[in-house]
A protein has these predicted regions:
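Anionic-ligand-binding alpha/beta catalytic cores of soluble enzymes and soluble regulatory domains
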Residues: 113-134, 227-228
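Core recognition of P-loop NTPase motor domains used across DNA-transaction enzymes
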Residues: 124, 133-145, 244
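Feature captures the catalytic cores and cofactor-binding loops of soluble hydro-lyases/lyases
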Residues: 50, 70-71, 170-254, 258
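Gly/Thr-rich phosphate-binding loop signature of adenosyl cofactor/nucleotide-binding cores
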Residues: 138-196
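Short linear loop/turn motifs
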Residues: 65-75, 138-144, 239-240
C-alpha cells in the first residue's frame, strides 16, 4: 500500500515567515532537482498574519499542518485483502485464504466498509464442530452455492433460491422406509434409483441431490418442476457429497461482527502496540479516513515499519522541532 516515497520539509514550532517560506522553497527545489521522492512542505504551528500576507501576495498555498511526526499505521506495509462479501461460501473463503497465504479475511460491503471478519480457525471450527443436520437451512444457504461446493449443476429449479427449511440427509433405504424419516422441505442426497427420486418428490422435499453424475429421468424432472423442487447433479459419490456439503454455508453465518478490533490508518504505532499485545489476533483490519477497510496488519509489521523521512529547516535545537522527531 505504498506509493512514491514522501519526505516532509518542516520548519520550527510557532513558525514565522522565514520558517514557512524555507519549507516551501526547499521542498520546491528538491522536487525540481531530484526524482528520489516527493517533497512536501509542512508547518508545525499556526500561520501568523505577516506570513499569511506574504503567501497571499505571491499566490502560494500554506503548507499542511502537522503536530506529530511519529510512525502511523499508514506507514506500515498494510496487507491488501482480496475482495470478499458475506454471501461467499466457507469453501470459497478457505480457498481464497489459501491462495493468498492469509489467515484472516475481512468481509466488506459494496462500499468497502467492514462488515465482519473470518479466520481460518473459524472455518475449521465450524466444519469440525457442526453436526447439526439443519445447519444449511438455518444459515439460509443458496442452492447455487451448494452446487458449486460439490462441483455440481442445478438441472432443475431456481439456483438463486435459498434452502431455508428442513434437514439434510442421505437416503439409501427402500421407498417404504424412506417415508419414515424424510420430511417435507428436507434436502435429500440420493443414488440412481428412480423410485427413490419419486418417493422424495412425493414427500415434497426442497431439493434432491444425485451423485456420480447420474442422469435423472425426464419423469422425475417433470414432477420436480411441478412442485418447485430443486435437483442438483454432482460427480461425487454420496459419502463425499455429505462430507463437503456443510462447506457451502455463507460466511455471514460464522463471521465475527461484534467487538472487532480495528485500527485507523491515522493511528500512531505507539498507541496500538498494547492493544495488539492484549488481543492475540493474527491480523487486525485497517480502516481509512473514508471508513473503508483497506487491508490488515499484524504484529510482524512492527519489524518493517517505514519511519517518516523529514528535512528540518530554520531550526537551532531539538525542542523547536515537531513532536516525535526522534522517531522519524
Amino acid at each position: 500500500m505504498r506509493n512514491q516515497e514522501k519526505i516532509f520539509v518542516i520548519g520550527h514550532k510557532n513558525p514565522d515567515t522565514d520558517s514557512i517560506c524555507s519549507a516551501i522553497a526547499y521542498a520546491d527545489i528538491k522536487n525540481r532537482t531530484t526524482q528520489s521522492g516527493k517533497y512536501i512542505p509542512k508547518r508545525a504551528g499556526q500561520i501568523n498574519e505577516e506570513t499569511q500576507f506574504v503567501l497571499n501576495r505571491f499566490g502560494v498555498h500554506p503548507p499542511g499542518y502537522i503536530t506529530n511526526i511519529g510512525t502511523q499505521v499508514k506507514d506500515m506495509d498494510i496487507r491488501m485483502s482480496p475482495e470478499a462479501d458475506k454471501s461467499m461460501s466457507l469453501k470459497n473463503a478457505w480457498e481464497m485464504m489459501q491462495q493468498n497465504s492469509i489467515v484472516s479475511l475481512p468481509i466488506r460491503d459494496k462500499d468497502g466498509k467492514l462488515e465482519g471478519l473470518i479466520t481460518i480457525g473459524d472455518i475449521a471450527k465450524t466444519y469440525m464442530d457442526k453436526t447439526d443436520s439443519y445447519l444449511l437451512s438455518t444459515a439460509r444457504t443458496q442452492y447455487r452455492r451448494i452446487a458449486e461446493t460439490i462441483e455440481g449443476t442445478v438441472i432443475e429449479g431456481n439456483e438463486h433460491a435459498y434452502f431455508v427449511k428442513g434437514k439434510v440427509l442421505v437416503a439409501t433405504a427402500n421407498p417404504e422406509m424412506m417415508k419414515t424419516y424424510i420430511e417435507e422441505d428436507d434436502m435429500v442426497i440420493m443414488g440412481d434409483r428412480e423410485e427413490d427420486h419419486l418417493e422424495a418428490i412425493n414427500q415434497n422435499v426442497s431439493c434432491i441431490i444425485v451423485g456420480l453424475g447420474i442422469q435423472v429421468t425426464e419423469k422425475v424432472i417433470k414432477l420436480a418442476h411441478e412442485r418447485n423442487i430443486v435437483i442438483i447433479m454432482s460427480p461425487y459419490d454420496t459419502f463425499t457429497i455429505a462430507r463437503l456439503i456443510n462447506q457451502s454455508i455463507p460466511i455471514r453465518y460464522v463471521m465475527k461482527t461484534d467487538n472487532l478490533v480495528t485500527f485507523s490508518t491515522e493511528d500512531y504505532t505507539d498507541d496500538i502496540q498494547d492493544v495488539m499485545i492484549k488481543n492475540r489476533h493474527r491480523a487486525f483490519p485497517v480502516i481509512d479516513k473514508r471508513g473503508r477497510c483497506v487491508g490488515t496488519i499484524s504484529r510482524r509489521n512492527f519489524l518493517d515499519m517505514h519511519r517518516k523521512k523529514v528535512i528540518l529547516v530554520d531550526h537551532n535545537e531539538k525542542d523547536q522541532a515537531v513532536e516525535n522527531i526522534e522517531k522519524a
